From Swiss-Prot:
UniProt domain SARAH: residue ranges: 271-318
Gene: Rassf4
Function field: Potential tumor suppressor. May act as a KRAS effector protein. May promote apoptosis and cell cycle arrest.
Residue positions where Phosphoserine is found in the record: S142
Region annotated Disordered, chain positions: 96-161
Keyword Phosphoprotein: yes
Keywords, alphabetical: Cell cycle, Phosphoprotein, Tumor suppressor
Name of this protein: Ras association domain-containing protein 4
SUPFAM superfamilies per record: Ubiquitin-like
GO biological process: signal transduction
Listed InterPro entries: RA_dom, RASSF1-6, RASSF4_RA, SARAH_dom, Ubiquitin-like_domsf
Species name: Mus musculus (Mouse)
Matching PANTHER family: RAS ASSOCIATION DOMAIN-CONTAINING PROTEIN 4 (PTHR22738:SF4), RASSF (PTHR22738)
Domain Ras-associating per the UniProt entry, residue ranges: 175-264
Length: 322
């Protein structure tokens, strides 16, 4: 059966589940119609009889703990030579740079970040806070890829507190460039370019590399979360892009979330249907179930008491017959 399904007429959904290619193409057509005129439309092609679909896959952040980013880029930290750093040049730079300029990341001339962080469709985020008071150029593997740090004049206590914290906001997320800790806003969406042959582990690795996350893919998992609260983990052998197409294009109904592997668990449909009820309603459900349980207990007790009585009567009849 598996060999038959592995033919050119089927597309794998996991290592043991297949879908007809014609059915998948029909779902893909619906998916692209929903995203018509947008960059989330998917392209498809065939290579040696194998259907390959590729495009952007939206993934929502569902982390409960901050994640740690790599502090250093592939290159070493670049310090400006002390011989060329003279007071005249410092005063010249301070005149050239406005206070607002010191709050935004500046890119090195002629270079482009290897992986540009795309969160909720914004191309770049504002960095809120002041830099460290040491003149050097720091390159990090995050959205705050290049930060010029310079000397500054005396500041108000509130500004000094920001310097001590070294805490920035990147598109609504919090990033501490001293500890390299990143806290994505829950439910915010990023995306990665994938294809239908990439497994869950490969997509996880791609996403973590994009944000230069130090933790390995084994510490995270992808979940499909339904609007009802139903939550299903994508297995390592599954293909997230195929799963997205099968669940439909509307992310108000189903989203794919990145979560911690040790803090998340699946929520079956039977449990999910009770999640959104208020506590008083749930308490009333529990009371009704208790009442029903008590009625069933009484019913079963009476039934077996009647059976016991019948058996005792029969035993007495047998004894008398002897």
């Amino acid at each position: 059966m598996k060999e038959a399904c592995s033919s050119s007429s089927h597309v794998p959904v996991s290592d043991s589940k297949y879908i007809l290619k014609s059915e998948l193409l029909s779902l893909l057509k619906t998916y692209n119609c929903y995203h018509e005129g947008r960059s989330f439309q998917l392209r498809h092609r065939e290579e040696e009889g194998t259907l390959i679909i590729e495009g952007l896959l939206n993934i929502a952040w569902g982390l409960r703990r901050p994640i740690r980013l790599q502090m250093q880029d592939d290159r070493e930290r670049v310090h400006l030579p002390s011989a060329t750093w003279v007071p005249e040049r410092l005063s010249y730079l301070q005149k050239e740079a406005s206070p607002q300029d010191s709050k935004v990341p500046t890119e090195e001339p002629g270079t482009q970040p290897a992986n540009k962080a795309e969160v909720s469709g914004d191309s770049s985020g504002a960095l809120e806070g002041e830099e460290e008071e040491v003149p050097q150029l720091m390159r990090t593997k995050s959205d705050a890829s290049c930060i010029i740090q310079r000397r500054s004049k005396s500041r108000a206590p509130s500004e000094a507190q920001k310097i001590r914290r070294h805490r920035f906001s990147i598109n609504g997320h919090f990033y501490n460039h001293k500890t390299s800790v990143f806290t994505p806003a829950y439910g915010s969406v990023t995306n990665v370019r994938v294809n239908s042959t990439m497994t869950t582990q490969q997509v996880l690795t791609l996403l973590l590399n994009k944000f230069r996350v130090e933790d390995g893919p084994s510490e995270f998992a992808l979940y499909t979360v339904h609007e009802s609260g139903e939550q299903t983990k994508l297995k390592d052998c599954e293909y997230p892009l195929i799963s997205r197409i099968l669940h439909g294009p509307c992310e108000k109904i189903v989203k794919i979330f990145l979560m911690e592997a040790d803090l998340s668990e699946e929520v079956p449909h039977d449990v999910a249907q009770y999640i959104k009820f208020e506590m008083p309603v749930l308490d009333s459900f529990v009371e009704k179930l208790k009442e029903e349980e008590e009625r069933e207990i009484i019913k079963l007790t009476m039934k077996f008491q009647a059976l016991r009585l019948t058996m005792l009567q029969r035993l007495e009849q047998l004894v008398e017959a002897k």
